[in-house]
Every structure is written in structure tokens, then in C-alpha cells.
Regions:
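Terminal domain-initiation and capping elements
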Residues: 1-120
């Protein structure tokens, strides 16, 4: 097994805790499904949120999905003028037999515009 990294992003419609849980949970579920991963394959997950998100920690959504024994951390994204608002980004470190080129990075909705080179 190799250590790989999977990227993901989602733009929230509004800054509400329940909405964040729903959207980030859906993003994580899609990352796991597209890469044939189970929670045991996760090493750690970094979450970043744009400075306009204040309602909750994105990592709370992972805990609600049952990802309870994986190290998680949240940080604030750089406050860049003109950047897409209300975005949560994910960087998950995983164990996988897949070649790096076969890792499916997931950007949901408008967030797909952030990294057209890797979003699938």
C-alpha cells in the first residue's frame, strides 16, 4: 500500500452548521466512494474553510459520518481578494494500491472551477 493524497472542495450556499454538515458529508462520501475507500484507509484529513465561514468546524461532518479515529484538523484558507466565497477544501491522506494517476479528486458544483486540472 502506498500513501496517497486526495483533494476535494465544495462551495456552500450559506453559512449554516446543518448545511455545512450536509455538504461536507456528501463531499467526503463521494471521495470515499470514487476511490473505493473505507474509513480504515484514511490516515488523516485536513480541512480548510474560507474566512467567511463561521458556523461550524468542517471536521464535524466527518465525525458525524462515523470517521472517529482518524486525525482531523481545520484551518482557515487565505483571504485572497476575488477568491470564491464559502468554500470548504479537503486534503485526505490515504492508504491505497491505486496509482497516483488513478486517484479521483472531487470538486462539487461551482467548486469544480477551482481546480479544473484535477476535478473529476
Amino acid at each position: 500500500m502506498a500513501v496517497r493524497a486526495v483533494r476535494g472542495a465544495v462551495q456552500l450556499e450559506r453559512d449554516e452548521a446543518g448545511h455545512m454538515d450536509e455538504q461536507v458529508g456528501a463531499l467526503l462520501t463521494e471521495i470515499l466512494e470514487r476511490n473505493d475507500l473505507a474509513a480504515d484507509d484514511l490516515i488523516s484529513i485536513w480541512f480548510t474553510a474560507t474566512p467567511d465561514l463561521h458556523s461550524d468546524f468542517p471536521a464535524a461532518a466527518a465525525r458525524k459520518l462515523g470517521i472517529v479515529d482518524v486525525p482531523l484538523i481545520c484551518a482557515q484558507e487565505l483571504d485572497i481578494e476575488g477568491a470564491m466565497p464559502r468554500v470548504v477544501r479537503v486534503l485526505a491522506h490515504i492508504e491505497s494500491d491505486r496509482p497516483r494517476a488513478d486517484i479521483a479528486h472531487v470538486a462539487v458544483g461551482a467548486a469544480a472551477a477551482l481546480r479544473k486540472d484535477i476535478a473529476q
